[in-house]
Amino acid sequence: MAYVITRNAADAEDATQDALVKAWRALGRFRADEPLRPWLLRIVANEARNRRRSAGRRERLVLRAAEGSGEAAPSPETTALAHERRAELLRALDELPDAAREVLACRYLLELSEEETAAALDVPLGTVKSRTSRALERLQEAYEPGT
């Protein structure tokens, strides 16, 4: 989560460590009837946003896309196409607004439910649904592999 927001491995590590310290200190305020994961992810996301804002970094987002089709030794053409498609997808993702990229990261990289995503990003459930829908539409328009 932190890496998706900061787009820098070192900043993401620092943000995660600081967030865990803050979570530890705030553990007494955690409501036991709420799920822990979204609460913790919200703290991490807030710390990462603070770090990114203060640093003013605008590095490119690097996502690990699943590559390969399970073949033992893909052909050079298959490998080249996979790298090209991944580069196209990364360019399309980088064109998305931060809020859209964050919601896609929660939903599809972290595999959070809509409710968990809303809690982690501290936004209403309807906002998660609309951001997800709009972000996927924008990706589909921008990323058309093979064209």
Where are these regions (language model features)?
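Helix-turn-helix DNA-binding module
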Residues: 10, 91-102, 110-127, 138
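Arg/Lys-rich amphipathic alpha helix in sigma70-family domain 2
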Residues: 4, 25-32, 42-63, 82, ...
